[in-house]
Amino acid sequence: MSAERLVNPHSDSDDQQVEKSLRPRTLSEFIGQEKVVEQLRIAIAAARGRNESLDHTLFYGPPGLGKTSLANVVANEMGAKIKITSGPAIERAGDLAAILTNLQANDVLFIDEVHRLNRAVEEVLYPAMEDFALDLVVGKGPGARSLRLNLPRFTVIGATTRLALLTSPLRDRFVAVHRLVFYSDDAMTEIVSRSARILGVPISPEGAREIGRRARGTPRIANRILRRVRDYAQVVADGAITLQVARDALAQLEIDELGLDENDRRLLRAIIELFNGGPVGLSTLAAALAEEVDAIEDVYEPFLLQLGFLQRTPRGRIATRRAYEHLGLPYPERTLPADDESGPQQATLF
């Protein structure tokens, strides 16, 4: 169910086609992530000035924030070709060897979900990143011998939503590590306005801001919502997205003022109504919602934690006072604060 949500930050096949047309090509076109962009600008200028390939770079952060877009921008700024793959797609060491031997000087190899590379593949990648060499074993048995094949200098750009799952040897081989954060409302408004121009959709500044501020600080979600609001404006209004049209469309899509959809509210209500506000274990909560544990951790929780609606404690998940207030539910006064280290206490009955 989470894969069908408008506010799901993960990409689907429909998104991928549209994202290509909306993707920035240069750092000057990239909106937001100012610190990362400035650091990349300096690194790229220095590498080009020395006529060298860019240092291996890692982007990490929640999905939908532009890690793939930045990799394409870096390749374009370096005047290099980019080869795009992902951790799960490289199943065997031979798959990676085939990719590496086809790279040209200064090419960029972008590995999405780099934390999902298996250990055998990582062992091949280590010397390739460090020494620009590919170690091969020729033959079998007693007659087997090792062969080192030199590779042209290239750049590996990795992307991950789970930095902690990267092995230390792999993480250490990335010279530059950049954290991408959720975007501000101003940046989101600018992104929506830019996407609307590219898609040929008339939109007012107020309409763009309304969509942007409800998109959970995530450009992928903003672009997805924009397409749905465009459809609404075309059928119900005169095709232009005004503030009122945006509000009406978002109400129909059940995306509230803070960017929560019905599934977010259902999760919070489950904690509050089924488990007395928590704490509740992740597996128990997933079973109650008929959701996967990974979906709750990766899709639902990051934004709810950012809003302060949810707490993670050693005893389980807890709905905060803010969550009660947002849902219009009375908050039970407790004998100890909800954020006490021992977790929430029994609600006061008398």
Curated annotation (Swiss-Prot):
Q: Where does DNA bind?
A: 312, 317
Give the residue ranges for region: Large ATPase domain (RuvB-L).
1-183
User: According to its UniProt record, which reaction does this protein catalyse?
Assistant: ATP + H2O = ADP + phosphate + H(+)
* Example of a GO MF term: ATP binding
Subcellular location, record wording: Cytoplasm
Region labeled Head domain (RuvB-H) — which residues?
257-350
Q: Where is this region: Small ATPAse domain (RuvB-S)?
A: 184-254
Keyword Transmembrane applies: no
> Which residues does the annotation say bind ATP?
22-23, 64, 67-69, 130-132, 173, 183, 220
The EC designation for this entry is: 3.6.4.-
Pfam families to which the protein is assigned, alphabetical: AAA_lid_4, RuvB_C, RuvB_N
Q: GO biological process annotations for this chain's record? A: DNA recombination; DNA repair
Keyword set, alphabetical order: ATP-binding, Cytoplasm, DNA damage, DNA recombination, DNA repair, DNA-binding, Hydrolase, Nucleotide-binding
Q: Which domain of life is it from?
A: Bacteria
Show the segment(s) annotated as Disordered: 331-350
InterPro entries assigned to the protein according to its UniProt record, in alphabetical order: AAA+_ATPase (IPR003593), AAA_lid_4 (IPR041445), DNA_helicase_Holl-junc_RuvB (IPR004605), P-loop_NTPase (IPR027417), RuvB-like_N (IPR008824), RuvB_C (IPR008823), WH-like_DNA-bd_sf (IPR036388), WH_DNA-bd_sf (IPR036390)
Family, similarity comment: Belongs to the RuvB family.
Q: Which PANTHER family match?
A: HOLLIDAY JUNCTION BRANCH MIGRATION COMPLEX SUBUNIT RUVB, PTHR42848
* Quaternary data: Homohexamer. Forms an RuvA(8)-RuvB(12)-Holliday junction (HJ) complex. HJ DNA is sandwiched between 2 RuvA tetramers; dsDNA enters through RuvA and exits via RuvB. An RuvB hexamer assembles on each DNA strand where it exits the tetramer. Each RuvB hexamer is contacted by two RuvA subunits (via domain III) on 2 adjacent RuvB subunits; this complex drives branch migration. In the full resolvosome a probable DNA-RuvA(4)-RuvB(12)-RuvC(2) complex forms which resolves the HJ.
According to its UniProt entry, the function of this protein is described as: The RuvA-RuvB-RuvC complex processes Holliday junction (HJ) DNA during genetic recombination and DNA repair, while the RuvA-RuvB complex plays an important role in the rescue of blocked DNA replication forks via replication fork reversal (RFR). RuvA specifically binds to HJ cruciform DNA, conferring on it an open structure. The RuvB hexamer acts as an ATP-dependent pump, pulling dsDNA into and through the RuvAB complex. RuvB forms 2 homohexamers on either side of HJ DNA bound by 1 or 2 RuvA tetramers; 4 subunits per hexamer contact DNA at a time.
Name of the protein in its database record: Holliday junction branch migration complex subunit RuvB
This chain's source organism reads Chloroflexus aurantiacus (strain ATCC 29366 / DSM 635 / J-10-fl)
